[in-house]
Amino acid sequence: DVCTDTPRDFLEYGGARELALSASCPEAGRLIYRNKEKMKVVEKEISEPFPWKETEDEQVLADEILFARNQAITILQNRSICVEERVCACLEYAKKVQDCLNQDSIVDIHKIPTEPYFYDTTDVEKESESEEKQYGLFLERMRLFSSLESIRTEWDELLLRFQKRYMDSEEGRQQYIADRKAYDDMLNNVNREYEKEQLIVYYCFLCLARCVDDYDFLGKMKL
């Protein structure tokens, strides 16, 4: 009841109200990872009136963004290819959606062909992440995490362990690359790749619809 009444993620748009747990919540983590089946969003109609009336343009935007989010999630759940390829395909699709938003062609979002992203990835531009790029992205994330205000000592201790193990030395860089490879191999070898998929899909659900406010669909996909 507490999570329903005071959810960490709350969004109203297009005549709908979306409630969700923060992905950092232990209960959310249990729900995200407990099943191998593809994640689904549960919708139900309630009698409560919507607090305001959307304009026609706002409703069109909401409908198109919801459609695009659903398409992105479907691409990410295409288990015929590996998660990394699905992410690349989804980013390519997001670029097309962003082009429509930038060109004020919102009504054309649902016209974007999606077949290449579902069935054939040969035409999708892919950039293989080198070990150096992976490590560079890790350093960027660490700089961001270190700039956030901490509310728990456990977070400070975790960052410190990461810094000691992976940063400020060539040995740390090599250790990160080795640990990253071991982690990826572990997930793939024990059939746990679905865990990556579930988390990415959950964040897409949380973030993508929020572009109804700032029109930054691609930016939120990159998150």
Sequence positions of predicted segments:
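Hydrophobic, aromatic-lined core segments that form the binding pocket/scaffold
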Residues: 80-223
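Internal, well-ordered alpha/beta segment that forms a basic, Gly-enriched binding/recognition surface
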Residues: 2-91
